[in-house]
């Protein structure tokens, strides 16, 4: 149905007592209403002038009776449409059959249009609201783009840094690019990132020329980077992010608070110094004590073991505040000395190594008690084990195993040792070193 300028639709039902056809119904509508009203409301004239639309009839013949649904579009006003609807109910015959006509509804088509307009306007407005960017977001977006543009690169390593890194008298050394960006958001532009735990040479040289603050994450990784910086760079102040947080995820208020609370490096050294020019790590005190497992106490005499392990504890648990090469040389010398005494000190380990060889199992000592498991079972229960006196595995010792166990045991023995970085408080031995 083409509604066009239609305002109302008249819905009508017709029941005829006999068989009639559609053209009989149309003829009855025009024939029986003709002359009832003035010429202004004559159906034929109204249809010719377009003030009423095409009359639509749906007809069914059931058990000798005819049922019709009639729709008549009207663009007349309310009064004229009501009169026209009432006129249709005067039809009492269709062809030769008696008939009854009843108006079921007069629909104001403009109501449905208004409802459509309301619903559509609501959806359009919602879309506009979703796409609209408020002033704050526009401002932040512009600032963010400027900060990203402000990130520069320093040195041959192309390290991310702030724009004031060259001209500022003081600098802040952070871990990565995200840290530099977060500090730029807070208006701090004299930052540079080391991009990893290995400190680039350009950072080492830069810290000698400028007042340097090391600003690291408040987690284990931050501690390791800080130790590396203290070993290799000329650090003046130390600042840490809140415990468990990273610099890149810290709010402006917290960042400024952490930087204001920075402490001189001498205070860090003083709090952790043993009086011989070395800085001890922040590991628990029990790790600094002699690390001889209880399992081996009966094998070795106290007079021989005690001085050897005290020396190891000092050398292995500390960070030398000297150039890296010298520190590495000193640690290697201690290990070499230990290797010459390995047969004497670890005679009891041979039995453990022999017991797990070619089995794929692991053996560890907890409170003087030996336990044997498959490696899978050991990993399942690792969270229940806080401290071990000793750990041996019939498999190569990888960096992952070292990272998992370095804070649980002082000694790890395996088929072979394949690690790139060894914690200073950990002793690593291969089967060949133990059996030799």
Curated annotation (Swiss-Prot):
Residues noted as binding Mg(2+) 2 in the record, renumbered to the chain: 217, 219
Cited PANTHER family: DNA PRIMASE
Record SUPFAM superfamilies: DNA primase core (SSF56731)
EC number(s) reported in the record: 2.7.7.101
A Pfam family assignment: Toprim_4
Lineage: Archaea, Methanobacteriati, Methanobacteriota, Methanomada group, Methanococci
Requisite cofactors: Mg(2+)
GO biological process, one term: DNA replication, synthesis of primer
Free-text remark on how the cofactor is bound: Binds two Mg(2+) per subunit.
A molecular-function term among this protein's GO annotations: metal ion binding
Keyword terms: DNA replication, DNA-directed RNA polymerase, Magnesium, Metal-binding, Nucleotidyltransferase, Primosome, Transcription, Transferase
Family membership: Belongs to the archaeal DnaG primase family.
Record-level GO cellular component terms: cytoplasm; DNA-directed RNA polymerase complex; exosome (RNase complex); primosome complex
Keyword match Magnesium: yes
This protein's record includes keyword Magnesium: yes
The name this protein goes by in its record: DNA primase DnaG
Domain Toprim: 169-243
Residues given in the record as Mg(2+) 1 binding sites: 175, 217
Its job: RNA polymerase that catalyzes the synthesis of short RNA molecules used as primers for DNA polymerase during DNA replication.
Subunit record text: Forms a ternary complex with MCM helicase and DNA.
InterPro entries (alphabetical): DnaG_primase, Primase_DnaG_arc, TOPRIM_DnaG/twinkle, TOPRIM_dom
Swiss-Prot/TrEMBL catalytic activity: ssDNA + n NTP = ssDNA/pppN(pN)n-1 hybrid + (n-1) diphosphate
């Amino acid at each position: 149905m083409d509604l066009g300028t239609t305002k109302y639709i008249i819905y009508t039902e017709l029941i005829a007592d006999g068989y009639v056809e559609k053209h009989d119904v149309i003829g009855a509508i025009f024939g029986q209403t003709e002359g009832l009203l003035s010429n202004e409301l004559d159906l034929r004239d109204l249809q010719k002038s377009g003030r009423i639309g095409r009359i639509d009839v749906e007809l069914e013949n059931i058990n000798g009776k005819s049922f019709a649904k009639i729709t008549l579009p009207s663009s007349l006003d309310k009064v004229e449409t009501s009169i026209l609807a009432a006129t249709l109910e005067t039809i009492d015959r269709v062809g030769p059959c008696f008939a009854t006509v009843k108006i079921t509804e007069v629909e104001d088509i403009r109501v449905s249009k208004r409802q459509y307009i309301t619903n559509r306007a609501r959806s359009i407005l919602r879309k506009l609201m979703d796409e609209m960017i408020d002033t704050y977001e526009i401002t932040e977006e512009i600032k963010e783009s400027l900060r990203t543009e402000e990130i520069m690169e320093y040195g041959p390593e192309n390290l991310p840094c702030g724009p004031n890194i060259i001209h500022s008298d003081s600098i802040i050394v952070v871990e990565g690019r995200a840290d530099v960006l977060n500090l730029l958001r807070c208006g701090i532009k004299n930052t540079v990132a080391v991009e990893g735990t290995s400190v680039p040479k350009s950072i080492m040289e830069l810290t000698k020329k400028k007042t340097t603050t090391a600003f690291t994450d408040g987690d284990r990784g931050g501690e390791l980077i800080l130790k590396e910086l203290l070993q290799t760079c000329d650090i003046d102040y130390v600042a840490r992010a809140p415990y468990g947080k990273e610099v890149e995820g810290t709010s402006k208020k917290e960042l400024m608070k952490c930087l204001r609370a920075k402490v001189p490096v001498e205070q860090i050294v003083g709090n952790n110094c043993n009086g011989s020019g070395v800085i001890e790590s922040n590991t628990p005190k029990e790790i600094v004590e002699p690390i001889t497992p209880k399992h081996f106490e009966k094998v070795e005499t106290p007079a021989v073991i005690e001085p050897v392990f005290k020396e190891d504890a000092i050398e292995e648990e500390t960070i030398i505040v000297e150039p890296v090469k010298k520190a590495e040389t000193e640690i290697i010398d201690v290990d070499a000395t230990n290797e010459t005494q390995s047969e004497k000190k670890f005679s009891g380990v041979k039995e453990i190594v022999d017991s797990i060889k070619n089995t794929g199992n692991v053996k560890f000592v907890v409170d003087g008690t030996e336990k044997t498991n498959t490696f899978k079972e050991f990993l399942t229960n690792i969270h229940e084990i806080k401290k071990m006196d000793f750990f041996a595995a019939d498999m190569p010792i990888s960096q992952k195993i070292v990272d998992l166990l370095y804070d649980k045991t002082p000694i790890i023995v395996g088929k072979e040792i394949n690690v790139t970085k060894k914690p200073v408080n950990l002793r690593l031995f291969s089967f060949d070193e133990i059996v030799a």
